[in-house]
A protein has these predicted regions:
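A conserved beta-strand element that flanks and buttresses the S-adenosyl-L-methionine
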Residues: 159
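Conserved class I S-adenosyl-L-methionine
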Residues: 23-84, 99-103, 124-127, 131, ...
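Short catalytic micro-motifs in class I SAM-dependent methyltransferases
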Residues: 162-163
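Short beta->alpha hinge that forms the Motif I/post-I loop of the SAM-binding pocket
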Residues: 119-120, 169, 192
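C-terminal alpha-helical "lid/dimerization" subdomain adjacent to the S-adenosyl-L-methionine
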Residues: 186-246
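Short glycine-centered segments of the SAM/dcSAM-binding site in methyltransferase folds
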Residues: 89, 185-186
Length: 249
C-alpha cells in the first residue's frame, strides 16, 4: 500500500524530484523554498506556527460562540464550489490543520481521493497529520504556494482557502495553482474580506499584532488571476465576510 501511494506521488512531482530524496518531518515532506521566506510569508508562517497548538480548539469553541452555525454553512458553501467526484487527485493549498476536510460532501468517499495538502506552517501540518491522515490517502508537504513541487497538469481538483490575502506574491501563487491543475479543472481561491479582517483579526488579542497594518483589496486578488483562465467569477459569502473566486483552466 505504501509503495502504491509513493508511486502515485512520484508521478505528481516536478521532473528531477524523487520521493525518496525528500527530507521529512515524520510523514511530512519538506519542500520549503527559502527564497519566499520573507515579508508577509515569514510573518504569518511564524504566527500559525505559534497558534497551531490552540487552533483547532479555537475553531471548535470560539468560532461557534461568535458566529453560531453560520460558519459551518460557509464551509459547506465553499466545498460546493468544487467539482467533487470519487477517485480524483486533489491539491489543497494552505490545508492548515485540515479541519475543512469534514465539510467535503458526504456523498464522496474520502478514502478514494488521492489527496495532497500543502502549507507554509510546519506546526499546522503536524496537527493535520495527527487528525486527518487516517481519514483519506493524505500526503502533506511543507511548501509555499509560490513554489509548488508538483508537475504541470497533475491534479483534478485544486483549491485554496485562507491565506492568499497576505501571500508575498499572489499572482505567482495563482499561476502555480493553475499550472499544476489538469486542463478543464475548476479552481477555488477563498479568503476573508477586509470587513472580517478589520472586525476580527485586528481586534483579537492573539492576532492583532500580526494584522495591525494589514489590508485586503479584492481588486488586487482578482487582478492576480492569470489572464488565460476561463469562467472567472467572484462571489461574496457569509454576509460579505468571505469571498470565493473561481475560474477554470
Amino acid at each position: 500500500m505504501l509503495h502504491m501511494i509513493e508511486t502515485r506521488l512520484q508521478d505528481k512531482l516536478k521532473p528531477g524530484l524523487e520521493v525518496e530524496n525528500f527530507q521529512k518531518d515524520g510523514d511530512i515532506y519538506l519542500s520549503l523554498n527559502p527564497d519566499y521566506l520573507s515579508g508577509d510569508n515569514a510573518k504569518y508562517m511564524t504566527m500559525y506556527n505559534r497558534m497551531a497548538r490552540w487552533y483547532d480548539m479555537s475553531e471548535k469553541w470560539i468560532g461557534p460562540l461568535l458566529h453560531g452555525k453560520s460558519i459551518d454553512k460557509l464551509r459547506r458553501d465553499l466545498m460546493e464550489e468544487i467539482e467533487w467526484k470519487d477517485n480524483l487527485s486533489v491539491l489543497y493549498v494552505s490545508i492548515g490543520t485540515g479541519q475543512d476536510l469534514r465539510y467535503i460532501p458526504e456523498t464522496i468517499d474520502l478514502k478514494s481521493l488521492d489527496f495532497v495538502g500543502v502549507d507554509i506552517s510546519i506546526s499546522m501540518l503536524e496537527k493535520c497529520q495527527k487528525s486527518c491522515a487516517k481519514k483519506t490517502n493524505l500526503q502533506l508537504f511543507h511548501a509555499c504556494a509560490e513554489d509548488l513541487p508538483f508537475a504541470d497538469n497533475s491534479f483534478d481538483i485544486v483549491y485554496h482557502i485562507g491565506g492568499i490575502n497576505f501571500f508575498n506574491d499572489k499572482a505567482k501563487a495563482m499561476q502555480e495553482m493553475l499550472r499544476v491543475a489538469k486542463p478543464g479543472t475548476k479552481l477555488l481561491i477563498a479568503d476573508e474580506t477586509a470587513d472580517y479582517v478589520d472586525q476580527q483579526y485586528k481586534k483579537n488579542h492573539f492576532s492583532k499584532d500580526y494584522f495591525k497594518d494589514a489590508t485586503v483589496d479584492l481588486s488586487e486578488i482578482e487582478n492576480a488571476v492569470p489572464s488565460e483562465v476561463k469562467e472567472k467569477e467572484m462571489k461574496l459569502l457569509w454576509d460579505g465576510k468571505f469571498y470565493a473566486l473561481t475560474f477554470r483552466k
